[in-house]
């Protein structure tokens, strides 16, 4: 399962790397003349209810794969050749209108073998858009469009604004994957329409959006509305997206899901990211760059109002975590570290990668936010997944309705009055200058915000760290002001049991003299080395 997942995600991620950049060809093939896309067949009445009925009908019928064997020249494209194929600006959907938004399409080839049908919706009527080889510039691919089937189809699409036709702000490409950016303009983590059996003992399933319906916006609209029809061996679904382009881009999503079979682990609103090396985990720290990650932590706002921060890791083995909840208020994968000096990468700009925050629109009931961390040696492999898993397994014949909002930007749209964690550092424990008699592991956790800046200026104030561990023992526990960050640093050592290399779950927060919390809750999982590898130097 992991090899299949690794191959699948690595191929998709590699393609995203290219399409996350501005069009290298710029306006080289842009013209003032706009060529309207050819339409297929007759327009038909369309709305979200009709799409849900179609998804329900799909689920009632046997599944069939839409993957096709592509013409040999497309199959043999290298990565560089494929990414040089660009949709022509003069063929962009809505380029012949005064709408604020435009759509450009991705070509099939390389890793993308499943045609996705594209429809335009105008005044409640949908009509399919025809693939046209002449709508693409084939760059250095060695192709010229001649000889390609007229009904080849598209792989996906991207959204631009009329003011910036070279850089997209959202894109849908590969299975049910999509991405967006905020004002930073830098792609990073992905979202998916649905996750099926991620991190389970069996093979993971990757549902596909098999059709998109793009609703023509009015000239003054700041929101573009689109719909997606999803299908896979175990489930079908209908989606409605309302995408508002802003400094923090917002997607308002409604989904209706229709299982074909019982699903072991259903993932709602999945976020997919990459974490290779960070301040707290340098297991893969042979790269010259200090840190390599799209996001550095999972942020939770639970149904009972608790704020939780869980730093990410690149584990030695697959790691799976469940955070039980009832009607969660939100969760997401965040990139809190925004300092270029911590990454030193002027090519992919990890410090500009967007956070992705999931906000349920109504009560989701009982279930859990689940976090899957997969070992990776390679930053082109997305190894982090977080999603909501309903407590009850879906069964055939059900209709499952989930509404939520996705926010893409430098910060999530919600914040707590409590202080928050800005850094987690780890290393060998002990007292500097004294010979170590046994193995321990040091944790240094920095908190800023809330009341901490004011408290840090008062010398006689008492701030108490509250620390819990599932095994082992804590040593040298302290919480002291750190004026350089206008906050507090908590430090402690963990001494593992001599006869156990089992993971240790750690829970930490700061409280005042009245027992009131001053910070969010910091959670961590540490896997101590086996006894033979516990070097004390």
From Swiss-Prot:
Cystine crosslinks: none
Pathway(s): Glycan metabolism; osmoregulated periplasmic glucan (OPG) biosynthesis
Organism: Xylella fastidiosa (strain M12)
Coiled coil: none
Keywords: Periplasm, Signal
One Pfam match: MdoG
Any one GO molecular function term: catalytic activity
Main localization category: periplasm
Keyword Signal recorded: yes
InterPro entries: Gal_mutarotase_sf_dom, GH-type_carb-bd, Glucan_biosyn_MdoD, Glucan_biosyn_MdoG/MdoD, Glucan_biosyn_MdoG_C, Ig-like_fold, Ig_E-set, TAT_signal
Matches recorded under HAMAP family: MdoD_OpgD
Signal peptide bounds: 1-30
Highest taxon of source: Bacteria
Subcellular location: Periplasm
GO cellular component: outer membrane-bounded periplasmic space
GO biological process, one term: beta-glucan biosynthetic process
Gene (name only): opgD
Protein's job: Probably involved in the control of the structural glucose backbone of osmoregulated periplasmic glucans (OPGs).
Descriptive protein name: Glucans biosynthesis protein D
Similarity remark: Belongs to the OpgD/OpgG family.
Post-translational modification: Predicted to be exported by the Tat system. The position of the signal peptide cleavage has not been experimentally proven.
PROSITE patterns the UniProt entry points to: TAT
């Amino acid at each position: 399962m992991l090899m299949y997942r690794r191959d699948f995600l690595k191929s998709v991620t590699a393609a995203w790397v290219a399409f996350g950049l501005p069009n290298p060809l710029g306006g080289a093939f842009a013209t003032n003349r706009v060529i309207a896309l050819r339409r297929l067949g007759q327009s038909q009445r369309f709305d979200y209810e009709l799409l849900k009925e179609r998804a329900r009908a799909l689920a009632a019928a046997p599944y069939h794969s839409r993957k096709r064997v592509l013409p040999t020249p497309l199959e043999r494209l290298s990565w560089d050749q494929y990414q040089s194929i660009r949709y022509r600006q003069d063929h962009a959907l809505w380029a012949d209108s005064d709408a604020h938004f435009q759509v450009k399409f991705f070509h099939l080839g390389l890793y993308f073998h499943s045609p996705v049908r594209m429809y335009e919706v105008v005044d409640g009527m949908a009509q399919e858009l025809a693939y046209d080889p002449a709508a693409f510039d084939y760059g250095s691919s060695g192709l010229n469009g001649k000889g390609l089937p007229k009904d080849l189809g598209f792989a996906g699409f991207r959204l631009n604004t009329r003011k910036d036709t070279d850089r997209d702000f959202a894109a849908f490409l590969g299975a049910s994957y999509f991405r967006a950016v905020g004002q930073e303009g830098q792609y990073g983590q992905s979202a998916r329409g649905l996750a099926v059996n991620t991190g389970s003992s069996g093979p993971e399933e990757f549902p596909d959006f098999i059709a998109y319906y793009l609703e023509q916006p009015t000239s003054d609209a700041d929101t573009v509305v689109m719909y997606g029809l999803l299908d896979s061996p175990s489930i079908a679904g209908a989606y409605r997206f309302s995408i508002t382009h802003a400094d923090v881009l917002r997607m308002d999503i409604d989904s209706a899901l229709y299982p074909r079979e019982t699903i072991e682990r259903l993932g709602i609103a999945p976020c997919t990211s990459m974490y290779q090396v960070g301040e707290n985990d340098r297991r893969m720290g042979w790269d010259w760059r200090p840190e390599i990650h799209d996001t550095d932590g999972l942020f939770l706002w639970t149904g009972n109002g608790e704020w939780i921060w869980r730093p990410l890791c690149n584990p030695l083995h697959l790691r799976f975590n469940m955070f039980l909840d009832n009607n969660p208020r939100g969760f997401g994968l965040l990139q809190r570290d925004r300092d270029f000096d911590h990454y030193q990468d002027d090519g992919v700009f990890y410090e500009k990668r967007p956070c992705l925050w999931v906000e349920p629109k109504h009560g989701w009931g009982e279930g859990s936010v689940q976090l899957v961390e997969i070992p990776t040696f390679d930053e082109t492999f997305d190894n982090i997944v977080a999603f909501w898993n309903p407590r009850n397994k879906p069964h055939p014949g059900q209709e499952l309705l989930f509404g939520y909002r996705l926010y893409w930007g430098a910060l999530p749209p919600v914040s707590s009055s409590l202080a928050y964690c800005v850094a987690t550092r780890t290393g060998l424990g002990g007292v500097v200058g004294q010979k170590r008699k046994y193995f321990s592991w040091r944790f240094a956790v920095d908190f800023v915000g809330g009341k901490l800046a004011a408290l840090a200026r008062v010398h006689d104030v008492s701030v108490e760290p509250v620390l819990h561990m599932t095994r082992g023992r804590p040593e040298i526990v302290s919480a002291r002001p750190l004026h350089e960050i206008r906050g507090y640093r908590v430090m402690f050592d963990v001494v593992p049991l001599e006869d156990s290399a089992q993971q240790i779950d750690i829970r930490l927060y700061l409280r005042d003299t009245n027992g009131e919390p001053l910070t969010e809750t910091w959670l961590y999982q540490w896997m101590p080395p086996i006894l033979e590898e516990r070097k004390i130097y």
